[in-house]
A protein has these predicted regions:
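Conserved protein-kinase catalytic-loop segment immediately C-terminal to the catalytic Asp
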Residues: 270, 275-277
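Phosphate/dinucleotide-binding and metal-coordinating scaffold of catalytic cores
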Residues: 1-259, 263-265, 277-381
Length: 381
């Protein structure tokens, strides 16, 4: 089937998508080179069907998503990639989508910012019963990434992302609350999170931070702005891209975020978990995105007895250990750490409500956070 790849109402390319699998099989024509998704380019800046296919596949629900297999069965969908076609590739992160060449649609009539969407896919992803014999598959849940169970819902006109916990402690939702409290204390722009209970489990909730005019460009996508020369580190290349488009204070904002990640022992700040905001109509860069997705942190998969501030913690995205990454960013970190006096009490208070915790876990995490704050202060001295 032949489609237009679109950005809002701008035609970007003519592409062919396999009807049975949902895979992109050809790029017939590029119509607007400047609007090609940055993430759909190779690292050398080139663009072809292989790079577009990789971008398209990465847009969908990953195979690692908890409960995906059962959800596909309930929705009568053989391949997860087909869910992308069912929702026209629409997302609540950006304004790219596809529409049939022989029956093109208008962006304003279909996008998830201005139009309601079904909860059928969200229900299936959480193992809930489908309310219709013919489920409505047009949902932003189809273009949500990550391995944790999650779903988009509409509440009071707002688009809200709900995300569950994992493992024996189900800790990730509480981690988001701790992270929000940390960012509040330090005066850092971030996406606010709160807790909700649904179906007997506690989940984190946050409102969509993009809109019909503004898109998220992750750091991984952003770094395709320029070809990355062999031997140039990701850190060096990231800074070169920031300088090329003159985003003010981008390096300092990212370094402050990574310093906060050190406090939180965040192990998953990969290049898709932070980024920049761009006007999807003018393509003007608006600045760094607020910090989001900090749940994989605070020793969430570590047994209570093994939690320790000094333990080696892996890091992303520019170094493999927290200590080595801290050395890299230290010259650019400017956080008012004096505001964190007594912050460990707040951490323990938040975790005291976690039903899956064993005795002493909340206090152990709070003590480790306090220790890491002191370690960061020492590195700053």
């Amino acid at each position: 089937m032949r489609f237009f790849l679109m950005q809002r109402n701008h035609q970007v390319a003519v592409i062919d998508i396999a009807e049975k699998t949902g895979d992109i099989i050809d790029v017939a024509e590029v119509l607007s080179a400047q609007r090609i998704p940055l993430g759909a380019k190779h690292s050398d800046g080139s663009f072809d069907v292989l790079s577009l296919r990789k971008w398209w596949a990465g847009r969908g629900i990953p195979a690692s998503r908890s409960g995906l297999e059962h959800a596909l069965e309930a929705l009568h969908i053989p391949y997860a990639e087909l869910l992308l076609v069912k929702c026209s590739g629409l997302s609540l992160s950006d304004q790219y989508w596809v529409t049939p060449c022989d029956a093109p649609q208008n962006w304003h009539d279909v996008n998830f910012y201005e139009n309601d969407f079904s909860d059928d896919v969200g229900r299936a992803l959480f193992g809930e019963g489908i309310l219709s014999a013919q489920p409505d598959l047009c949902s932003p849940c189809n273009t949500s990434d990550g391995f944790l169970q999650k779903r988009w819902r509409i509440a009071d006109g707002k688009r809200i992302l709900l995300k569950a916990g994992s493992g024996i402690y189900k800790q990730e939702p509480y981690n988001e609350i701790v992270a929000s409290a940390l960012y509040d204390a330090l005066g850092m722009p971030h996406v606010p999170y709160w807790l909700v209970e649904q179906g007997g489990q506690v989940m984190s909730a946050c409102a969509c931070f993009t809109n019909e005019h503004t898109e998220l460009v992750t750091a991984a996508q952003f770094m395709r702005l320029l070809p990355q020369a062999q031997g140039v580190s990701n850190w060096e290349h990231f800074n070169a891209c920031c300088q090329a488009v003159e985003i003010p204070d981008a390096r300092e904002a990212v370094c402050n975020m990574l310093a906060a990640d050190f406090i939180l022992a965040n192990t998953d700040r990969h290049l898709g978990n932070f980024g920049f905001l761009r006007d999807s109509e003018t393509l003007e860069w608006k600045g760094t995105a607020p910090i989001y997705d900090s749940g994989t942190s605070l020793w969430q998969m570590t047994l209570t007895r093994a939690i320790c501030a000094e333990a080696m913690v892996p890091a992303k995205p520019f170094e493999t250990s927290q200590q080595s990454q801290l050395k890299l960013i230290a010259p650019y970190v400017d956080l008012p750490l004096e505001r964190l006096d007594g912050f460990s009490n707040k951490v323990e208070e938040i975790f005291q409500t976690a039903a899956q915790f064993d005795d002493g876990r909340a206090a152990k995490i709070a003590a480790a956070v306090s220790g890491r704050i002191q370690m960061l202060r020492f590195n700053r001295a």
